[in-house]
């Protein structure tokens, strides 16, 4: 397996980043589960950034398979429902690993819940070493604890891995004052503060994740994952996005 690198002259803004995407992003137009062509398309977006020499961490939600809050709302014990959601993220991580490795990118799935036969346990120093070797690290099973979202897990791992930013791939090209899919007069922020996101409930991430990013001065870049080349373009200083910062 080989992995092509970008020419040394290619200028990028970041050396190490965290990409956070929802499980629903892997569904395509389906209502449930994984849509292999969509998984492959997202893998190619990651490949384009990897070719720039950027070290990539990745966290994927599990909502396309099971969402803990929904299970809890239907009468299931919240802790059990959350653990089921964590297992769903492992399934998504394995699917993305297969897609990335089919493109020649060395990838490691690292789980907060030990399951040695399918992925590595989370050991911070080992994960950092993988990144230094230009392997993509997919962090699965959230934080390993119930009551924490994958947004919070992504922010935690981004801080532990010393990432320079979190890239939140969504259905829209940034943060808006209201849902642009419902309101034609919705306005996009170029930049917005962590506190404003919290005060106005802008829906960037959950409150715990935003507070953790704020307390560690970790920027959040919100962009459209549906825009071809969008992830790579932002790293080249192009494209449309919103930057959440202090």
Swiss-Prot record:
Localization annotation: Cytoplasm
BP GO annotations: 'de novo' CTP biosynthetic process; UDP biosynthetic process
Keyword hit for Magnesium: no
Catalysed reactions listed for this entry: UMP + ATP = UDP + ADP
EC number assigned by the record: 2.7.4.22
Keyword DNA repair: no
A GO CC annotation given for this chain: cytoplasm
Keywords: Allosteric enzyme, ATP-binding, Cytoplasm, Kinase, Nucleotide-binding, Pyrimidine biosynthesis, Transferase
Binding of UMP, residues: 62, 82, 143-150
Entry GO MF terms: ATP binding; UMP kinase activity
Membrane-spanning parts: none
Associated pathway: Pyrimidine metabolism; CTP biosynthesis via de novo pathway; UDP from UMP (UMPK route): step 1/1
Annotated region described as Involved in allosteric activation by GTP, given as residue ranges: 28-33
Quaternary organization: Homohexamer.
Similarity remark: Belongs to the UMP kinase family.
General function of this protein: Catalyzes the reversible phosphorylation of UMP to UDP.
Protein name, UniProt field: Uridylate kinase
Species: Cereibacter sphaeroides (strain ATCC 17023 / DSM 158 / JCM 6121 / CCUG 31486 / LMG 2827 / NBRC 12203 / NCIMB 8253 / ATH 2.4.1.)
Taxon lineage: Bacteria, Pseudomonadati, Pseudomonadota, Alphaproteobacteria, Rhodobacterales
